[in-house]
Structure formats: C-alpha cells, structure tokens
C-alpha cells in the first residue's frame, strides 16, 4: 500500500553523546541523570540523510539557498496521498522549525496586546513566542484525570478565555506536550 512506509533502521544501537556539546546530555548534572526534558532523540541519523548532507558539504560553498520546487511538490503529494488534502504550493510557508513557525503564526494573526490562549501545561516555547510578539498569555489549565491518567480540556474555562474581547488566537498543541495525549476528534 502506498500509505504504508516500511523503514528498516536499528533503533537499539546506543550512541553516547556526552562530550559533544549536546544541550541535552552535557548540561545534565551527572552521569546518573537521564534527561527527559527535551525532545532530542538519541538515535543516529538515517544514513540517507547523512549521505545527502555529505554531498552538500562536499560542494564546499555554503551561500544562501532557496527551497527547491521538489520540496513543495513532495509536501503537496504527501498530504494528498496521506490525508486526501489538496492545496497549492503557494499555500506552504517554509520555516526552519516549529518555534519559528509558532512565532510567525502569532505575528501574522495578532496585534500587540492581543491575548493568545494556551492550555497548560504546554510546550515551554509557546510562552516566549507569545511574549516576544508583544502579546499577553491567557492560560486555560488542563485537568489531570487521575483515573484515566491523562490531561483533559476544561471546556468551560477555555470558552471563557476564548470569549475575552482581546483573545485572538488559540495555540493548540496536538499531540500534547508534555502530556503526550492526542486530542480526540470530539474534543477538537
């Protein structure tokens, strides 16, 4: 099936990253500490990616680059094949990562002083992205369900916050970080 991706890769190979300027490992207090606070995977990069990087490095010039048409074509094709969604390449905005994308969204959709609603606890970079764009944080606390061992949305509180006259944007983290929960279709 075209939607099934088979990847043969060894995820059991341990790789020590201490002493490599690893933000995750070299800032840990001791060898007996397992740093689980950052989404920094401890698996070696897939060989196809390192080969592509070597090919680029072998060129020996690192000037400004543009995003090639093949990138946009691949994104459009993937979304159509995987989700049945069709859109044009002009609908895609390339960013260098999640945090710059969050900041760009806030900048595009809000004005200074607007409120941005989050459901906390949530990915820490949401907070600095909101502040750095001159907006005010409005945090709707998630409810921890001790029976189901998961976070749940407090819809009454969320509705109240979203109804505020200065609320302009809801930053939804899905899957939720740090809870790991994928919000259900009914919740969304």
Report the location of each language-model feature.
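N-terminal small-domain helix-loop-helix segment of the aminotransferase-like
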Residues: 8-97, 104
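Short, Lys/Arg-enriched N-terminal segments with co-localized hydrophobic residues
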Residues: 1-6
């Amino acid at each position: 099936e075209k939607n099934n991706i088979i990847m043969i890769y060894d995820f059991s190979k341990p790789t020590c990253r201490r002493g490599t300027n690893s933000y995750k490992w070299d800032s840990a207090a001791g060898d007996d500490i397992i740093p689980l606070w950052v989404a920094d995977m401890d698996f070696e990069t897939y060989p196809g990616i390192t080969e592509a990087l070597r090919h680029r490095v072998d060129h020996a010039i690192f000037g400004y680059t543009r995003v090639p048409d093949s990138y946009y074509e691949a994104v459009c094709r993937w979304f159509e094949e995987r989700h049945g969604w069709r859109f044009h390449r002009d609908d895609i905005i390339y960013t260098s990562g999640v945090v710059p994308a969050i900041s760009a969204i806030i900048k595009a959709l809000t004005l200074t002083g607007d409120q941005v609603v989050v459901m906390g606890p949530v990915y820490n970079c949401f907070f600095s992205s909101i502040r750095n764009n001159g907006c005010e944080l409005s945090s709707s606390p998630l409810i921890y369900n001790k029976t189901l061992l998961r976070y749940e949305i407090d819809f009454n509180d969320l509705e109240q916050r979203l109804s505020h006259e200065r609320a302009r944007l809801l930053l939804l983290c899905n899957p939720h970080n740090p809870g790991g929960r994928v919000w259900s279709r009914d919740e969304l």
